[in-house]
Amino acid sequence: ISLYIYTKMATRNARLKNKIEQSKIQTWKFVPKPTETKSAFPEISDLAFYLYESGNFPVYTDSDVEYFSCGEDFFPDFMQELKNAKEFIFLEFFIITPDDSWQKILEILKQKVTEGVEVRVLYDGIGSVLASTKLYHKYLASLGIKSKIYMPLTPVFNLQQNNRDHRKIAVIDGKISYTGGLNLANEYFNFGQNKFSYWKDSAVKIRGNATKTYTALFLQMWNLAKFPEKKFNKSYEKFFPAIKENSKEGLLIPYADNAYNEKDIAENICLYILSKATRNVCITTPYIIIDNQLKSALIFAASRGINVSLIVPSKPDHFLTFCIGKTFLKTLVENGVHVYLYLPGFIHSKLFTSDGKIATVGSINLDYRSLFHHFEDGLLIYKKSVIEKIQRDIELTKLSCKEMTLDDYKKLPLIVKMLGRIFRIFAPLV
């Protein structure tokens, strides 16, 4: 029986890997090659080389980026760009909840369909469980909106159910894209009441050719969901329009990661930033359940005099994850990492910055699920003025935090410490 299950799972994984590779082959042809986007920054050329060789993620020196430090700032900008759409709208989110915020978005999408704009919506079958019914799928179809559910929840045992589509990507006309920590639900924009009082998150808006990578990522994931499209070349070329240069400052590298590429791209970027830091590293993450390699890199950076600061929630979102995370935080504090507990509510932002010159923003948490199991995306930013705004947001956020001490850990309820220690053994599964 065990051999049968193993063989069945291996066959399924091989099929999925093959689908991923075929989808990449058909979409990456529309994304610039390294010769067209050579980095003007030799000090980061090794990372640029790695990202292209490992995932076909090119450097863009002609695109601009805008940072949003909260959902309230993101939402009106996002809504306006949806209204401005002329050709197509692609939305890929882990969570879409049919609440007030989604209804506002849906009204615009309905209007754009009547104007001839192609609208596609892709969402995860577990994250968006309330929208994952066949009935809701049919409802969107009745509005003229194409939709797909990635890996709907089924009663049949399937290890692939653990590999969720955790990405947050929006593409408008192939010229503008968004990514970050925000999903499409009320709490992310602080609409009405939520159990955390305030939800702190972040996002970026990309304008220019760098959007091509996000367009390709969306189409790849679209093809992995049910009923993949057979013809790429003729139907997909229109989603990659020619775009004039928008910026001559710094560079952007949009990137992604998943459980099937066996490259650990997301973690390797974190390790790279930590290894190159000369003054400081600032991180925000809602969860902290990491492997020994990343834990050691954080501790080593602190031990060589780098000011390493980590902002995490003070309140639990998922109780067991919170308990396990506390054991990792204790280890980091013991070894010189500054841990800040966010007090006003829940921080869901995923930022990784260093020395005021490099930063990442995206959907990636510092936990096993994001780093090794899920489909994720991010944006690497280098030597752009927007990094100053990101750094300023982090410093302002620290003012709303309490720095964690070992005494704080000792004062935790016994049940939190016990569960954390017991289940830390199973951290890769949580």
What function would you assign to each model-found segment?
Residues 1-268, 272, 276, 300, ...:
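N-terminal localization/anchoring segments of enzymes in phospholipid and broader phosphate metabolism
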Residues 94, 286-287, 321:
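Glycine- and other small-residue-rich loops at beta-strand/loop junctions that grip anionic moieties
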Residues 143, 307, 311-318, 325-326, ...:
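Cytochrome P450 I-helix active-site segment
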Residues 284-285, 312, 342, 361-362:
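Thr-Gly-centered strand-to-loop micro-motif
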Residues 287-308, 313, 318:
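Helical hairpin unit composed of two closely spaced alpha helices linked by a short loop
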Residues 293, 322-324, 354, 372:
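Histidine/acidic-residue-rich catalytic or RNA/ligand-binding cores of hydrolases
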Residues 350:
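Catalytic-core elements of nucleic-acid end-processing and repair enzymes
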